[in-house]
């Protein structure tokens, strides 16, 4: 499902633990990391897509998380020209995303990146809230910045928490 401007509707998932760290997942067979995300199917709401993608990509269900907030509108990024498939119709030039901020309610052991026949990730880790901005592929960076900035006040309620989140650090990586 691609809109008239060539953008595919999509949900982005920022999953935070009780320390305000966020789940950062490694694309299978690559040294590329990102937040879980995925397309919205025809007749599916963004929230429906969120829960489907949560299950498909990291093995969690609705009872494992709590929705804290979501972005007010759609955030868009364009794909680099080399990634646009001009032979497919309609042509997809990028993604428009509704971002959700979730709180993890279950133990870390519930996260499973290998729970499907075709997993998208082969590892994950908890990282400080702002760490992904310096690590994500460049064409997604502005959307990540906008989503993280808009949602941060919903996660961090005082300046001390905010400053702790600004300390970019990696945590122990989990393999599948």
Swiss-Prot record:
Q: Which cofactors does this gene product need?
A: a divalent metal cation
Keywords carried by this UniProt record: Hydrolase
What organism does this protein naturally occur in?
Marinobacter nauticus (strain ATCC 700491 / DSM 11845 / VT8) (Marinobacter aquaeolei)
Give GO terms: molecular function aspect only.
mRNA 5'-diphosphatase activity
Matching Pfam families, A to Z? NUDIX (PF00293)
Q: What does this protein do?
A: Accelerates the degradation of transcripts by removing pyrophosphate from the 5'-end of triphosphorylated RNA, leading to a more labile monophosphorylated state that can stimulate subsequent ribonuclease cleavage.
Q: What is this protein called?
A: RNA pyrophosphohydrolase
Q: Which family does it belong to?
A: Belongs to the Nudix hydrolase family. RppH subfamily.
Cite the EC number: 3.6.1.-
Q: Which GO terms describe its cellular component?
A: cytoplasm
> Which InterPro entries does its entry note?
Nudix_hydrolase, NUDIX_hydrolase-like_dom_sf, NUDIX_hydrolase_CS, NUDIX_hydrolase_dom, RppH
Biological-process GO terms, alphabetical = mRNA catabolic process
EC class name: hydrolase
Short motif (Nudix box): ranges: 38-59
* SUPFAM superfamilies associated with the record: Nudix
Domain Nudix hydrolase: residue ranges: 6-149
Q: Which gene encodes it?
A: rppH
């Amino acid at each position: 499902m691609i809109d008239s401007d060539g953008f595919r509707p999509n949900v982005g998932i920022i999953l935070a633990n009780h320390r305000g760290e966020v789940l950062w997942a490694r694309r299978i067979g690559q040294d590329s990391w990102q937040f879980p995300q995925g397309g919205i199917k025809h007749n599916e709401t963004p929230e429906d897509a969120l829960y489907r993608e949560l299950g498909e990509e990291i093995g969690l269900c609705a009872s494992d998380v709590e929705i804290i907030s979501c972005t007010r509108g759609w955030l868009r990024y364009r794909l680099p020209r080399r990634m646009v498939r001009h032979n497919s119709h309609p042509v997809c030039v990028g993604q428009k995303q509704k971002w959700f901020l979730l709180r993890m309610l279950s133990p870390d052991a519930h996260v499973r990146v290998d729970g499907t026949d075709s997993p998208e990730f082969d590892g994950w880790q908890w990282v400080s809230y702002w760490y992904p901005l310096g690590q994500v592929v460049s064409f997604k960076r502005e959307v990540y910045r906008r989503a993280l900035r808009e949602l941060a006040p919903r996660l961090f309620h005082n300046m001390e928490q905010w400053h702790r989140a600004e300390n970019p650090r990696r945590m122990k990586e989990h393999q599948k």
